[in-house]
């Protein structure tokens, strides 16, 4: 898997446009895990990163009814993973229930930090999270307002 390198900042970047199909979460998992592995991430970071990316892509498909764009950057041992969609409204962190609600909840528990960037206009947003490449298991709320 190849990544771009910003020569000025040393940030490694890769992105993938995902279709609005049932295969998108699986593609996101494979893409995320592969890139994190190429960057030397710990097994835990690879697993947690692919899980959170998959959940956020699933949220885009289910709630935004939109294709998603997955963007990953790595700098100074930290990966930032973003999922952008064209759906209206912001996601809401809630307690999971029998019918779902695990996406943001898992992200809140596993990520170092996370947040939402509204798009200009009435539709669209980017949900992002950060995770340490050398990270290990951690369970704490990390929402950045």
What are these regions (language model features)?
Residues 3-6, 24-30, 41, 75-76:
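Short hydrophobic/aromatic-rich motifs at helix boundaries and adjacent loops
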Residues 15-27:
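STAS-typified acidic loop motif
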Residues 26-54:
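Conserved short strand/loop->alpha-helix "switch" segment adjacent to the catalytic nucleotide/phosphoryl-transfer site
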Residues 55-59:
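Short, solvent-exposed helix-to-loop capping segments enriched in aromatics
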């Amino acid at each position: 898997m190849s990544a771009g390198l910003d020569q000025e900042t040393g940030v490694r970047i890769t992105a993938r446009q995902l279709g609005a199909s049932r295969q998108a979460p699986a593609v996101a998992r494979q893409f995320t895990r592969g890139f994190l592995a190429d960057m030397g991430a710990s097994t835990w970071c690879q697993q947690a990163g692919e899980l959170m990316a998959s959940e956020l892509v699933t949220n885009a498909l289910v709630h935004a009814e939109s294709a998603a764009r997955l963007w990953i950057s790595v700098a100074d041992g930290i990966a930032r993973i973003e999922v952008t969609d064209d759906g209206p409204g912001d996601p809401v962190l809630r307690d999971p229930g029998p019918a779902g609600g695990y996406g943001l909840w898992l992200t809140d528990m596993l990520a170092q930090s996370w947040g939402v960037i509204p798009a200009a206009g009435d539709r669209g947003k980017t949900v992002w999270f950060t995770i340490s490449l050398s990270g290990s298991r951690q369970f704490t709320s990390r929402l950045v307002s």
